[in-house]
A protein has these predicted regions:
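Intrinsically disordered, low-complexity polar/acidic regions
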Residues: 2-5, 30-217
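N-terminal alpha-helical signal peptides/signal-anchor transmembrane segments
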Residues: 3-33
């Protein structure tokens, strides 16, 4: 039991550190007129996440998009050098998000480029909590888009909402209307636990429910 409690505390400490990383991303957006792809790359690179935050799969930004904005959004991202870009999955929905920045932009993370996380129920629930509360929210267990056919791990995502600057955010409705997107991180569970506990060979089976709420506690 003592070992379980120590593990739980270690996980909580690390998750709070990851939350602060996301808050730094929100701060970057709030301090800038425009955060470009290069700016986001430079920001995440400066964090040296592999060394300082082992276990994190990346740090990204998912843009919130209304249906009448979708085509212009796709054209803009394609003009940045991604001619095949689209928002996935295809189909008409009342609202969309799209992962437009995710660093490091390696082979795994490129698999998530353009994915609408609102299209999947578990991710949607966490994103709605983050949007409505203004706080960090963590999803339940999912299989990340980053997974390949080998070494498939359970995963989860941490979200922090980004709102328009200079608007009132006192009510849920105001927060919903001011939403611009989410700074977020995906986590692969085994990699995360190795990063926290420093154990390379052990198979980890951790209950994600301890994080599945409106805030990390």
């Amino acid at each position: 039991m003592q070992e379980t409690e120590r593990t739980r505390e270690a996980v909580q400490v690390r998750m709070h550190a990851y939350e602060q990383v996301l808050r730094g991303g929100i701060g970057l957006f709030n301090a800038s007129e425009h955060v470009s792809r290069q700016t986001w790359h430079d920001y995440v690179s400066s964090l040296n996440i592999n060394e300082n935050f082992p276990g994190i799969q990346g740090i990204g930004f998912s843009q919130y998009i209304l249906p009448d904005e979708l085509q212009r959004h796709i054209e803009r991202i394609r003009s940045e050098g991604f001619p095949e870009y689209t928002v996935k999955p295809a189909g008409k929905r009342p609202e969309y998000t799209s992962i437009i920045y995710l660093e490091p932009f390696d082979a795994r993370n490129q698999r998530a480029f353009g994915f609408d996380m609102l299209s999947e129920a578990t991710r949607h629930a966490a994103m709605a909590r983050a949007r409505d509360t203004g706080h960090t929210a963590v999803s339940g267990k999912v299989i990340l888009k980053q997974e390949t056919s080998k070494d498939i791990q359970s995963g989860f995502l941490m979200y922090l909402p980004l709102y328009r600057k200079g608007v009132n955010l006192d009510s849920v409705e105001q927060r919903q209307n001011a939403l611009l997107g989410y700074v977020y991180s995906p986590f692969r569970m085994t990699n995360l636990m190795r990063g926290i506990l420093g154990q390379e060979e052990k198979s980890f089976d951790i209950d994600l429910e301890i994080y599945d709420g409106t805030e990390i506690s």
